[in-house]
A protein has these predicted regions:
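A short, flexible beta-alpha/helix-coil linker loop
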Residues: 46-48, 149-152, 184
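The AdoMet/dcAdoMet-binding core of the Class I SAM-like
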Residues: 54-170, 192, 212-217
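N-terminal auxiliary segments of SAM/dcSAM-dependent transferases
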Residues: 1-40
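Soluble, non-transmembrane catalytic domains of enzymes that act on hydrophobic metabolites at membranes
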Residues: 23, 28, 42, 145-150, ...
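Short, basic/glycine-rich phosphate-binding loops at helix/coil junctions
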Residues: 35-44, 144, 176
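Loop/helix-junction capping segments adjacent to catalytic residues or to phosphate/diphosphate-binding pockets
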Residues: 50-51, 188
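Surface loops and adjacent helix of pleckstrin homology
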Residues: 44-46, 112
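C-terminal substrate-binding/active-site "lid" region of AdoMet-derived donor-dependent transferases
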Residues: 155-222
Length: 223
C-alpha cells in the first residue's frame, strides 16, 4: 500500500495512530509510529528514539554542564537521532558530532523519517561501536553519549573492561560521558561492580536510577 502524503498522514494521526514497519537484522521489526503529529521510533519492546528514551537522555544531560559549546561530541548508538536536538537546541552545543550506529535499517529510518543525515557538523558512521572505538584518536571528545541497546538488551561488551578503558582514552581530560544502562543489568568488569571499576580507572562517577528500568552513569575523566 502506498504511503499517504506527509501532511495527510500527520492530520490522520490526530484521529488514529499510524505505524509503518521496517525489517531490521538486529532488532526484528522497527516501528515508526505517528500519533497526534508526533513521530517515534520503536521496536516491539522498546522505544528507540523520540519517546521515553529522549526524556531519559534529556534528564541525564541536566547533570552534564556545557564547558565548551564548540567542543566535539561522540554519540555511541545514534538510533533515530533524538539526542541531537537535545545537544543542539537545548544545550546549545555547536561543535562537531560523530555518531556511530550499528544498524543500517535504523540509519535509513533516521534519514527518511527524521531527516537525520551526515552533514557539515554531523558525521554518521555505520559501524559496531565496540570495534570502532579503539581506532578513534585519543583525547578527542569533550562529551560522549553511550546508548548501546539491542531492543531491551545491553551488549555483553559493556560488562568488559576494554570498552570502558577505550572510553576513558577517547575523552579529553575533564571530559564527560552520559551512559544509559539498565537497572536490571549486572555489569562486573574484571569482577568489580561497574561504578567501583570506573572510579579505579580514573572517572568520577554519578549513578542515577530513572524511569524504573533505566540507570544513568554520569562520568568525568579526572586526568
Amino acid at each position: 500500500m502506498r504511503l499517504l502524503p506527509t501532511t495527510v498522514r500527520r492530520l490522520v494521526s490526530y484521529l488514529v495512530p499510524l505505524t509503518r514497519r521496517v525489517p531490521s537484522a538486529y532488532s526484528g521489526w522497527l516501528e515508526i509510529t505517528t500519533w497526534r503529529g508526533h513521530k517515534t521510533l520503536n521496536t516491539a519492546s522498546a522505544n528507540y528514539s523520540y519517546g521515553l528514551l529522549q526524556q531519559v537522555l534529556r534528564y541525564g544531560l541536566r547533570f552534564v554542564p556545557v564547558a565548551d559549546a564548540a567542543a566535539p561530541v561522540l554519540v555511541l548508538g545514534l538510533g533515530g537521532g533524538s539526542v541531537l536536538p537535545l545537544l543542539r537546541h537545548e544545550q546549545g552545543r555547536t561543535g562537531p558530532v560523530t555518531a556511530i550506529e550499528l544498524d543500517p535499517a535504523v540509519l535509513e529510518v533516521a534519514a527518511t523519517e527524521f531527516d537525520v543525515r551526515s552533514g557539515p557538523n554531523l558525521h554518521i558512521v555505520c559501524a559496531d561501536a565496540f570495534a570502532w572505538l579503539p581506532a578513534a584518536p585519543p583525547s578527542s571528545f569533550e562529551l560522549a553519549i553511550v546508548d548501546l541497546f539491542l531492543d531491551l538488551t545491553l551488549p555483553t561488551e559493556l560488562g568488559e573492561a576494554a570498552f570502558w578503558q577505550q572510553l576513558w582514552r577517547v575523552l579529553q581530560p575533564g571530559g564527560r560521558a552520559l551512559c544509559n544502562l539498565l537497572t536490571t543489568a549486572e555489569l562486573w568488569p574484571e569482577g568489580q561492580p561497574l561504578p567501583e571499576f570506573l572510579e579505579e580507572l580514573g572517572f568520577a562517577v554519578q549513578d542515577i536510577e530513572v524511569e524504573q528500568l533505566n540507570r544513568l552513569l554520569i562520568l568525568q575523566r579526572l586526568a
